[in-house]
């Protein structure tokens, strides 16, 4: 007997979302009552644009550090294969508005003050593809995303 599996991200109608946005995909409770929250951090409009791998890779490394400086409980923030944003997994319950504020603050730091020396994990020892980074691209994309504003609603623009 095979188990039916539904992958939420493949059920989402990507033609009706309005990026950039933060969307709560769902919350799950563990056997001891612990809660994790899963977020869709969509930075560019699906099927219209994508962030080049080097820029996305650098944003990924920076977010790994910058998010943790701003909020407790981040488990992981990993890029989508389509290169339009990230999945972010958090301990506990959080609102899209709260996470959108954190992402906005991180992107502001990337766009305005980040230098190459600030990017963590860019050596052969600390990164599995250390040559594929671009701070220039990361900064330019951060500026473009911030110019559009980050919404806390995937379907109606509500810029925070």
Swiss-Prot record:
Residue numbers binding Fe cation: 57, 61, 127
Quote the record's cofactor note. Answer: Binds 1 Fe cation per subunit.
* GO MF annotation list: iron ion binding; S-ribosylhomocysteine lyase activity
Gene3D superfamilies per record: S-ribosylhomocysteinase (LuxS)
Q: Which GO terms describe its biological process?
A: quorum sensing
Tell me the domain of life: Bacteria
Biological role stated in the UniProt entry? Involved in the synthesis of autoinducer 2 (AI-2) which is secreted by bacteria and is used to communicate both the cell density and the metabolic potential of the environment. The regulation of gene expression in response to changes in cell density is called quorum sensing. Catalyzes the transformation of S-ribosylhomocysteine (RHC) to homocysteine (HC) and 4,5-dihydroxy-2,3-pentadione (DPD).
Subunit annotation: Homodimer.
Task: Provide the family line.
Answer: Belongs to the LuxS family.
Question: Which NCBIfam families is this protein grouped with?
Answer: PRK02260.2-5, PRK02260.3-1
Spell out the protein name for this chain.
S-ribosylhomocysteine lyase
Source species, please? Streptococcus gordonii (strain Challis / ATCC 35105 / BCRC 15272 / CH1 / DL1 / V288)
